[in-house]
């Protein structure tokens, strides 16, 4: 086996025909500026080729389902192992996915609870014991003399198949009837079941009317049914068609409740035998939220206080006005009064209806006038009924804007049915155990006391649970609970969970490619992550990590610096070798920052703010412990703390959502807090995240920043366009008129290849230019609209230097370090860091009010230290204009440049949620209890 991976002639995206050697069984870090070509080399070339070769080895039938990977633009790659990509874009959005299910810990927990769990009665909580035939007979006879009963044996419960043999055996044994999926069949007829569906089948053993003289017959029938089904007896009570399940295995003597034998599926919320029947295992239900129906209580009903569809036009001539006028007359209130001044009785009637009491509705329509007497359903029952009845996705989506998720009333958000939640191990239900953090869950397993027999059964299961929980702790995720929904995890957390799962698999000879695993990780936990990566390497695997973290780069066996610039200025190998060799290379920008020759300077002075504060009182969302914090306005404030300490709960869930609801009229549900003071000093809140600026290839930096509107207006004002009668719309590639109709303005055509990947070829009519011939004949300074879209920001800045409006927007794009991107570049090809800087540039180009608060969550994700320097300059400019910038960040280069810090902790999860310290970076660095302060101290020397 070769000792290296050889990449020859890589040209994917902006890579300039580069050759790279990567040592096998080593930790290699690829670094470089944002947009320099790191991901193009690691993911789009090496990983894509590894995947393609694997998929190509499968049959054409299998390839049809997997989707064929396109061959990357590379001459050849030698020494390639099977490749596994662990990136940040694959976080599951499935509401059924949790930390426990993703890591497979939950599978072992289900097995443990099924094998050594102690069942209890879901009614009285008493421990359930096995039920005898005599007890079953006593309960059936208690139904009363004359009751008609069918005794059935449940032979198949929730299993796929046609089950032909079951019917044949029953027929051969002399039985006459069976019930399949609730339908009764005669065994003499042909019974056909769908092979791929799950079925329930019961054999009818006896049909009888309960009387004292049938006890012996009933006993024989129950014993026969139990023998057929392995201990289960189903009594079908007629004529109600009500089923009672009895079990020789487990039953409560006092309540007479039976439960089936404990199986792993009883503890799965993704299986109908375990899931709560009310919420089907989701743990939540969508309910109409009064706070979202009437978000602003200072507005009157007449002025549109109600935001719900169908009830938001009280001034109109519709039915809503009729109802509200009748309500105001009957309950003596004015439609002009602010909602907050209406009594609780009036609000209850408006929201929940008149409970059958009729109103006098007066109508005056073109077709006539008159009086109707009708009850008022109430806004909330009306919205809930319409939501259940509608078949329209559009209506459903509109109604969901007034709804919020709340815990299921039946299971209390625990996802499982009552019988499953009543089974305990060590005194805890499986749901209670999953509410524990990883570190507490490990302690519980270590201290668990089992009988000798239970220990023999559960020993191997407990070992697997401990191993998997240990892997989660080793990647710095000890604060997560196993019940945490996967959709709520950050990109870094999701990636580290997948990393922990891979360590658990103990594979050898695999090529792992990771994308910034240090994201969201405090400096304190970095050593744990590095130890995990080295452990994966020492198993005999090759690791390629795209990373900007200096500690990770120093710990690498081999370092590759891609650059020297970004976009068209990048795509070359600037330096490679050991970290020491890269540091010694004068051409490497990364090496200069690693060696300390270049660094981000600490500001000479810290801003004090404008004298006003935004204060959060009594924050209690997630793990926040009644927290009070104040943020000085007019400053650059950083919220720090270890992973899981409560930063996102405070900033994203409480501050952003509360300000968004009050200042921006957003329909959101803010996190729990007693009050937020100081809102009057702000006019709007803007969250600048790394989400894409558009999800279709038609979206680009020019359209997002509104540059394209100005460019189209400019082309429409040319003499040529005026002579032809072209307006600005003619120069849009999204509408008919100016665009090329052969490709609908896409510039390319998709050709489906079935067993091969779809091919995109340039449109033959417009040659990829998106516009028709007539539109392209209109020129400004010798360039067509298509030529302008192909320009980089730097080229456009020079081209439009005489036009102040265009020049200002282009200059801000250049100042945030995006001079290399093309104006018409598809937004889907931009990295998260690039998308975030496009948003920042858009905000910078707007006229500042000086009263805006900007919120950024880990803005340095995907950014090289040199990019971070540019980002900080932009953020400082926003603050210099009088605005407030609030940032969640772990990168010390950003933290040291802040005016004010809020350090949460001290630990993650239940050990966090308090304010450890606050103040300037120097004051936080002086705090011995602050983990952030300990690392910050070295940076401020």
Regions found by a protein language model. Name each.
Residues 1-941:
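Conserved phosphate-binding elements of NTP-dependent enzyme cores
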């Amino acid at each position: 086996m070769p000792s290296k991976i050889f990449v020859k002639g890589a040209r994917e995206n902006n890579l300039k025909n580069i050759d790279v050697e990567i040592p096998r069984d080593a930790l290699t870090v690829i670094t470089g500026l944002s947009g320099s070509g790191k991901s193009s080399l690691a993911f789009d070339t090496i990983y894509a080729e590894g995947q393609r070769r694997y998929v190509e080895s499968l049959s054409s039938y299998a390839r049809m389902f997997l989707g064929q990977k396109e061959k990357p633009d590379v001459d050849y790659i030698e020494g390639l192992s099977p490749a596994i990509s662990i990136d940040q874009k694959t976080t599951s959005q499935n509401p059924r996915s949790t930390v426990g299910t993703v890591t497979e810990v939950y599978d072992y927990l289900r097995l443990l609870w099924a094998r050594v769990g102690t069942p209890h009665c879901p009614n009285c909580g008493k421990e359930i014991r096995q039920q005898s035939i005599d007890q079953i007979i006593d309960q059936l006879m208690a139904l009363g003399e004359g009751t008609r009963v069918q005794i059935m044996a449940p032979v198949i419960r929730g299993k796929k198949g046609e089950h032909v043999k079951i019917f044949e055996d029953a027929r051969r044994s002399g039985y006459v009837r069976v019930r399949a999926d609730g339908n009764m069949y005669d065994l003499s007829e042909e019974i056909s079941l769908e092979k791929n569906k799950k079925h329930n089948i019961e054999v009818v053993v006896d049909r009888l009317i309960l009387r004292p003289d049938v006890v012996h017959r009933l006993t024989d029938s129950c014993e026969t049914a139990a023998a057929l089904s392995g201990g289960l007896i189903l009594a079908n009570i007629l004529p109600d068609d009500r089923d009672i399940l009895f079990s020789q295995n487990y039953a409560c003597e006092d309540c007479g409740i039976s439960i089936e034998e404990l199986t792993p599926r009883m503890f799965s919320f993704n299986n109908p035998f375990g899931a709560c029947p009310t919420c089907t295992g989701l743990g939540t239900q969508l309910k109409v939220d009064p706070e979202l129906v009437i978000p602003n209580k200072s507005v009157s009903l007449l002025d549109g206080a109600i935001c719900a569809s169908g009830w938001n036009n009280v001034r109109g001539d519709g039915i809503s006005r009729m109802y509200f006028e009748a309500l105001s007359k009957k309950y003596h209130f004015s439609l002009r009064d602010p909602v907050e001044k209406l009594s609780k009785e009036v609000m209850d009637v408006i929201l929940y209806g008149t409970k059958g009491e009729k109103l006098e509705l007066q109508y005056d329509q073109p077709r006539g006038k008159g009086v109707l007497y009708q009850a008022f359903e109430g806004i909330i029952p009306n919205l809930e009924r319409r939501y259940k009845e509608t078949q329209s996705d559009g209506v459903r989506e509109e109604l969901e804007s007034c709804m919020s998720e709340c815990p299921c009333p039946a299971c209390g958000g625990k996802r499982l049915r009552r019988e499953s939640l009543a089974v305990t191990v060590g005194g805890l239900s499986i749901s209670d155990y999953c509410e524990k953090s990883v570190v507490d869950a490990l302690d519980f397993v270590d201290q668990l006391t089992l009988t000798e027999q239970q220990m023999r059964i559960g020993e191997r299961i407990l070992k697997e649970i401990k191993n998997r929980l240990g892997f989660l702790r080793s990647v710095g995720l000890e604060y997560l609970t196993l019940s945490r929904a996967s959709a709520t995890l950050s990109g870094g957390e999701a990636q580290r969970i997948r990393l922990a799962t891979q360590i658990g698999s103990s594979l050898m000879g695999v090529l792992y490619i990771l994308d910034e695993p240090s994201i969201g990780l405090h400096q304190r936990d970095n050593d744990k992550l590095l130890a995990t990566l080295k452990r994966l390497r020492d198993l005999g695997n090759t690791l390629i990590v795209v990373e900007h973290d200096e500690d990770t780069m120093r710990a690498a066996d081999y370092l590759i610096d891609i650059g020297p610039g970004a976009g068209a200025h990048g795509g070359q190998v600037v330096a490679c070798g050991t970290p020491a060799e890269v540091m010694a290379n004068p051409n490497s920008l990364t090496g200069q920052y690693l060696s300390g020759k270049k660094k981000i300077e600490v500001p000479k002075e810290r801003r004090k703010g404008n004298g006003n504060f935004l204060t959060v009182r009594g924050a209690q969302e997630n793990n926040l412990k009644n927290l009070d914090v104040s943020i000085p306005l007019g400053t650059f404030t950083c919220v720090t703390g270890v992973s899981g300490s409560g930063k996102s709960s405070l900033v994203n869930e409480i501050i952003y959502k509360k300000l968004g609801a009050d200042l921006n009229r957003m329909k959101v549900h803010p996190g729990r807090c007693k009050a937020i003071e100081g809102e009057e000093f702000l006019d709007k809140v803007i969250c600048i995240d790394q989400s894409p600026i558009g999800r279709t290839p038609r979206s680009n930096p020019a359209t997002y920043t509104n540059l394209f509107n100005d460019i189209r207006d400019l082309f429409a004002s040319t003499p040529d366009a005026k002579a032809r009668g072209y307006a600005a719309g003619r120069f849009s590639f999204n509408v008919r008129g100016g665009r090329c109709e052969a490709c609908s303005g896409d510039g390319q055509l998709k050709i489906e290849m079935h067993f091969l990947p779809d091919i995109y070829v340039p449109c033959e009519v417009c040659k990829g230019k998106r516009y028709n011939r007539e539109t392209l004949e209109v020129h400004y300074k010798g360039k067509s609209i298509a030529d302008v879209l192909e320009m980089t920001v730097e080229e456009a800045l020079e081209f439009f230097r005489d036009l102040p409006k265009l020049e200002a927007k282009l200059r801000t794009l250049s100042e945030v370090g995006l001079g290399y991107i093309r104006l018409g570049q598809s937004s889907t090809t931009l990295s998260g860091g690039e998308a975030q800087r496009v948003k920042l540039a858009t905000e910078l180009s707007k006229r500042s009010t000086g009263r805006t608060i900007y919120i950024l969550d880990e803005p340095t994700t995907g950014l090289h230290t040199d990019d971070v320097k540019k980002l900080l300059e932009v953020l400082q400019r926003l603050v210099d204009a009088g605005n407030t910038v609030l940032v969640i960040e772990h990168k010390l280069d950003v933290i040291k440049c802040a005016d004010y810090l809020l350090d949460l902790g001290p630990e993650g999860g239940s050990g966090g949620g308090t304010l450890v310290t606050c103040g300037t970076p120097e004051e936080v660095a002086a705090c011995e209890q602050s983990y952030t302060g300990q690392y910050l101290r070295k940076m401020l020397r």
